[in-house]
């Protein structure tokens, strides 16, 4: 097994291309699962183990927030945000998504279907526990892909709104065919290739987040190429089916984000079937916005957004295209 240390996703692809250029040409699209293939429900009974869910319960809850972490992270990402929201009346349920945290096999891609099925199961369970409480989805990066893909696949889910924090989306990516070919080639020819991802977050994230990514053994550091490919195809699925997400969405994106492009977020917002999508941007936000030093300010804005939705203000007002996307 080959192991190399690289700074991030772009470096991963660069190493991949160097390793595979002499091996073979990119396979035809038919040799791998097309990103747009409709996701099917996994068999019933695939229960979520209790130790995969962390809960912070509000004393008098006004709503439930189901939180979905980013790629390589786990439910402990919300050890600060969870109790902070609970103190303000929002019960939080954070899930170790499959292959992450306590979910085994750690670091292996389970497929899009199980991730989507888990989100649907979380929503349905929360509704069964308290049918009168609105449910919000909060997803960061890969978690944003999972949240959006789940609602696109299961439009019957009753969700009051989605907070998509730098979600994994791929609309408007320049030379996407080239990157797709690179990812497909790696997935097919070198799926077991392991690359070490160990970015330095010290200048962009809060100290607790820096410590977690540096020392927490539950963080995925050695990333398999087929796992990385699965994250990409999940993002593509969410992008291809974004027009089926009817719940109100607020998209957050920062200019310091080296992973997601603003145009990808803006295209998703424009595609909302009811015009109920907002885009917030900030010059200083990194990719992991909710783990930046000013995360409480951002969280307060999200609470305000949820309160506006609860008061029907968003649904009642005239749809408008978000200003950050008018450039």
Where are these regions (language model features)?
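Short beta-strand/loop motif that positions the catalytic acidic residue
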Residues: 245, 251-253, 257
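Catalytic active-site module of serine/aspartate enzymes centered on a nucleophile-bearing elbow/loop
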Residues: 276-278, 282-327
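An N-terminal hydrophobic leader/cap segment in hydrolases
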Residues: 17-57, 324-327
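Catalytic nucleophile-loop/oxyanion-hole region of alpha/beta-hydrolase
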Residues: 71-75, 101-130
